C-alpha cells in the first residue's frame, strides 16, 4: 500500500507505477495554496513496494537526502506502510545530526481511492517539514508526529497505524500542529 496513484490496482493489491504520483499531486489544489511551503518531487528509480525494501534502498534514500541537503529546508519521504517504521529507524541513525526535518509518511488507503488518509498525511508532513522546527527523522501518520527510531506499526487496517509506545509523540495535529 502507498500514497497515491503511484500504485496501480492489481488483482492482489497495488503495484508501484512510475510518474503517476506527480499527476495525482497536480490534482490536489491545496498543495499549491499560498500557505503551503514550496515543494519539489524526486522519484526513486525503480519504485518498490515497501515490503521489498532492503538496506540498499535505505542507503539510496539517505544518499538522496545528503545529495540535496543544501538545496532544501526539509524532506518528506513517501513510503509504503509495510516497512515505514523500519526505514524511519534506519534513517534516524544514518542521518544523525540533522539541522532539518526528514519526515516519512504514507497512507493506509491510496489517494487514488475516493476515501483516503493520504491527502492529510502528505499535506501535514509538508507543513511540518516546511516549518523547520524539527531537526531529525520522524514519521507522521494519522495526526501524530513520531520520532523515527521510536515508531512502530500498530495496525495493518486502521488509519491510526503507527504508535510510539515508549516515547511521547513529538506533535499532534489537530486544529493546530
Question: For each predicted feature, which ranges?
Answer:
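Gly/Ser/Thr-rich loops at beta-strand to alpha-helix junctions
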Residues: 5, 79-85, 144-146
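Short, glycine-/small-residue-rich phosphate/pyrophosphate-handling segment
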Residues: 111-151
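Accessory alpha-helical/coil subdomains and C-terminal extensions
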Residues: 21-33, 147-177
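Glycine-rich oxoanion-binding loops at beta->alpha junctions
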Residues: 38-68
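Short, small-residue-biased leader/transition segments that mark boundaries at the very start
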Residues: 1-7
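Short beta-strand segments
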Residues: 77-79, 103-106, 138-143
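Short Gly/Thr/Asp-enriched flexible loops that form oxyanion-binding sites at enzyme active sites
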Residues: 78-100
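Short acidic, glycine/serine/threonine-rich loops at helix termini
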Residues: 8-12, 88-89, 114-117, 147-154
